[in-house]
Amino acid sequence: VYPEGFSIVDARMILGEPIRHPRAEDLSEKRLASLKAIFDAKSVAVVGASRPGSIGGIILKNSSRLEKLYPINPKRDKLMGLPCYPNLRAVPESVDVAVFAVPPHDTIRGFKEFCECGGKGALIVSDGYAEIGRPDLEDQLKAIADRHGVVYIGHNGLGVFDNFTGFNTLFLPMIRSQLPSRSGPIGIISQSGGIGLELLEMAAEDNLPIGTWVSVGNASGISIPELFVHMGRDDRIRSSRCAWRGFATACSS
């Protein structure tokens, strides 16, 4: 209270242990190696690849620049001229990265199979876990990831757009989105797929050279600090931008 009036301050105080900001050395090298494999993918499987216009079908089409692309669908013989496989074990080589565009129970089963087959890193774009009251399903994914040392980006996110390799899991038709055509030293990390896509389209409009874009969604498989460390170690990326709503944990170890 002052002679000329008063001031009101609105603040929230969180009591407990002081916040310790994560450092690069706190983060697991094994997890970072798995994350790096996603952006160095030589072979990619799309689990749930399907008809044109479906989520899996759009991801398959958008990633067609990749040299080795494997659609996984037990009900199809071919998609986009590529032979389909009933499951990941049927693929004739070890797949580096798998994208899961199937419901939670199928994702859990497929992710376990992927890890057992020597997979290196995954992306889970589907939802239906803790955000709708099924933390048990999310815990199953995390347990598989921890047991095998394989990380996944997601769940419930748009995944990645990598201009260096052509890996693109955005499940939006290209006619609806203007994406950067030039690869370059800028990386973008976003929790929100919508905000992240808006940033990507703004970059395209300004002709900015975007190298890597990531939508982490619920970030149950990999943390934003880990993605920052990954981009910091990537010689191709010199500037990283991030849009986030909040952190559940500071970092994973």
Predicted features and spans:
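Catalytic-core regions of core metabolic enzymes
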Residues: 1-253
